[in-house]
Amino acid sequence: MQTTTQTIIKQQLLASLATLKQCVDTCPKEQIHEKHNDYPFSQVVFHTLFYCDFYLSKSKGTFFKQDFHIKNKNIFADYEELEYRLPTKLYEIAFLNQYIGHCRKKIEKTLEDITDIELKQNAKMREKEITKEELFIDLCRHMQHHAAQLGLRIQILTGNELQWITSGWKEY
C-alpha cells in the first residue's frame, strides 16, 4: 500500500490537533483564562483552531457559512481573529472541545477529498502566494507551535509533560 501526500499531511495535522486537545484536557481549569506573559490559554487555543478551520476552507465565503459558525454565531460574531487588533474574547472548555471536533472532521474530509492537482494549486486563503500543499504543512507547524507553547505552560504549572503523538489522532 502506497502512502499518499494527502495521508501524510492528514496524519500530521491530526497529531498536531490531538496535541492541542491534550493541552485543553490537561490545563488546570482555573488557568484556562489566565495570562502568562502573553495571551490567555483559551485565546491561544481558539486562535489555533480558528486558523486550522480557516486555512482548510475553500474560500472566506464558505468559511463564514459553515453550520458550525452559524450555530455559534454569538462566539464568532465579528471574527476578531481576522482583524489586526488584540483579541478580547475568552472561550470555555466545552466550546473549545466542540471546535476541536469540528476541526478534526474538517481535516479528515478536506484531505480525503483533495486531489494531487489541487494540492499544487494556489491557496486562496493567504495573501502571500503559496500552494495548498505548503499551506497545510505550514498549518501543521502553526498548530504544533501553539501546542508546544501551551504544553510548556502546563509543564510549568503542573510538572507534567505532554505525551508525544507521532501520527494521527490519539487521546490521552
Describe every region a protein language model picked out.
Residues 8, 39-43, 95, 131-138:
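Amphipathic alpha-helical recognition patches that constitute DNA-binding helices
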Residues 153:
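A short helix-coil junction within the Rossmann-fold of NAD(P)-dependent oxidoreductases
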Residues 21-36, 104-140, 157-171:
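Acidic interhelical loop/turn segments
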Residues 1-8, 51-106, 110, 118-122, ...:
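Short, helix-capping/interhelical loops that line the mouth of catalytic, cofactor-
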Residues 44, 74, 89, 135-136:
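Alpha-helical interaction segments
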Residues 13-20, 41-56, 97-107, 139-150:
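Alpha-helical transition-metal enzyme core signature, strongest for iron centers
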